[in-house]
């Protein structure tokens, strides 16, 4: 594709848990090969404390970011736009430059009810699923695949459990 880092936008509804963890993971694991950002269609007031604690537990750099909306991001050039929740997939805006679109649907750990142990486990499980999917993305020979084949492979990553 290009010599510059691949630009990836992770979308969810609140931009408080899944998309924040995905952004942090890809920026950390991608080591300059990828530039990830995240946003939400209806951003929450703050990043979920369990998402922050999970990132910190795995020593993933997290720079005290706040949830943000999609406004303005739909005018930026993206190589990949990846939704991590069904609601974001349904309301995904049109992006210029025909980025590759993929849906990596997963349960929202912020909606899990129960005691603290149960909630922490839900965030850990979501983090580990995102980590596996990002590892699969990183293993793809992105520079060698034609666009259609690449888009199909990135979409298939969303089926990984």
Predicted region positions:
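Redox-cofactor binding/interface segments in oxidoreductases and associated redox assembly factors
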Residues: 83-84, 103
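Short glycine-/acidic-enriched loop or helix-start segments at secondary-structure transitions
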Residues: 20-22, 48, 89-94, 113
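Short, Asp-centered acidic motifs that coordinate Mg2+ and/or phosphate
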Residues: 80
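Conserved active-site segments centered on acidic
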Residues: 1-71
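Phosphate-binding/catalytic loops
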Residues: 92-161
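Short glycine-rich anion-binding loops that position phosphate/pyrophosphate groups of nucleotides
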Residues: 16, 86-89, 108
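Short histidine/acidic/glycine/proline-rich micro-motifs that form metal-
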Residues: 41-43, 88, 144
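Alpha-helix C-terminal capping/helix-to-coil transition sites in glycosyltransferase folds
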Residues: 75-77
């Amino acid at each position: 594709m290009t010599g510059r880092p691949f630009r990836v936008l992770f979308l969810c509804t609140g931009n408080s848990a899944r998309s924040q963890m995905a952004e942090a993971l890809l920026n950390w694991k991608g080591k300059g090969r990828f530039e990830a950002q995240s946003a939400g269609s209806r951003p929450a007031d703050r990043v979920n404390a369990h998402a922050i604690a999970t990132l910190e537990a795995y020593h993933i750099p997290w720079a005290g970011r706040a949830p943000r909306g999609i406004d303005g991001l739909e005018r930026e050039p993206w190589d990949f736009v990846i939704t991590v929740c069904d609601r974001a997939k349904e309301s995904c805006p049109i992006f210029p430059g025909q980025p590759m679109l993929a849906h990596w649907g997963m349960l929202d750990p912020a909606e899990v009810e129960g005691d603290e142990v149960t909630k922490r486990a839900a965030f850990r499980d979501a983090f580990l699923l995102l980590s596996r999917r990002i590892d699969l993305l990183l293993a793809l020979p992105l520079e060698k695949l034609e666009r259609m084949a690449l888009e199909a492979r990135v979409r298939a990553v969303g089926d990984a459990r």
